[in-house]
């Protein structure tokens, strides 16, 4: 699994790690503060759901045709592409396409 530290996650340092295996995991992060609100806030609780898809670009097109707007792109990475959608109740969905079968490359957060 992956894990690491971000010195400035929207104004606060956090540490995080994956619980699971190379193909299915839950990401746990520190830095929680206060009640659950928008995903960019600093709260203890559920941040987002990640779903692996075979083709992110095709997904973006399908969701756009269905009326869903892209919230933001993930960071550029050689072994994955991810996008995020925010639904009306504040739940963030991450859709991720992997370009590698190797867990160490899929879950590399140093690139």
Describe the residue ranges of each PLM region.
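A cross-kingdom feature marking solvent-exposed beta-strand/loop segments within repeated
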Residues: 33-37, 72-73
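Vicinal oxygen chelate
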Residues: 14-21, 37-111
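Short, surface-exposed linear segments at secondary-structure transitions and domain or protein termini
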Residues: 35-40, 104-107
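Core segments of cupin and vicinal oxygen chelate
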Residues: 1-24, 65, 73
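Active-site donor-binding loop signature of nucleotide-sugar glycosyltransferases
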Residues: 19, 30, 97
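A glycine-rich, hydrophobic loop/mini-helix early in the fold
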Residues: 25-32
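Short, structured motif recognition centered on aromatic/hydrophobic residues
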Residues: 26, 46, 93-95
């Amino acid at each position: 699994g992956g894990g690491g530290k971000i010195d400035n996650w929207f104004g606060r340092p956090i540490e995080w790690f994956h619980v699971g295996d190379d193909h299915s995991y839950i990401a746990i992060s520190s830095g929680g503060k206060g009640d659950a609100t928008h995903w960019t806030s600093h709260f203890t609780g559920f941040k987002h759901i990640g779903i692996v898809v075979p083709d992110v670009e095709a997904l973006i097109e399908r969701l756009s045709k269905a009326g869903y707007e892209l919230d933001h792109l993930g960071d550029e990475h050689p072994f994955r592409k991810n996008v995020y959608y925010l639904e009306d109740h504040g739940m963030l969905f991450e859709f991720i396409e992997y370009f590698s079968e190797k867990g160490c490359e899929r879950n590399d957060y140093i690139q």
